[in-house]
Amino acid sequence: MNATAWQDCTFTSADGLRLYYRDYPCAVPGRLPVLCLPGLTRNCRDFESTALRLQRSRRELSPDLRGRGGSQHDPDFRNYHPGTYVADLALLLRHAGVERVVLIGTSLGGILSMLIAATSPQVAAGAILNDVGPEVAQAGLQRISSYVGRHTPVASWEEAAAQMRSMYGVAMPDATAADWMA
């Protein structure tokens, strides 16, 4: 265990990739663990503060999906797909010795949570969804595809704030210039 109270763990996917997750153990036995699933371009670190709070009363697992964070890159772009991610997560749970979880998912992680609940209801005790719902509008998908993987280097904080505003401003129309710089 490291100084921040989690264990760095890896498991092997069905197609041989080394995939990473953080395991935040809990001293209280018998409570349902939580599986926290990040958004499209995010990783397990998004849930660190949540996990540290949850750890007082339950175990928490946070993966880096394939090709992100500490997980190995998949050379086959067709495997960056929700069905593949769900299969990877089933192997993660088996590796961690977990049969049933409460899911917390942000954006893509919320979609994966819904897929797990629909395809493996015996695994999903409940779900908390953030930044996603049962329907995803085509306009939202087009907006996301317009900026994912297209970040350009910036020379100043002002340029960085402008880039963030161009990508996320539609979701936060009331944010001021000072908010984007914060």
Task: Describe every region a protein language model picked out.
Residues S49-L52, S62-I104:
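Active-site loop/oxyanion-hole signature of alpha/beta-hydrolase fold enzymes
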Residues E99-Q138:
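Conserved hydrolase catalytic core segment
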Residues A155-A182:
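Conserved alpha/beta-hydrolase catalytic His-Asp/Glu region
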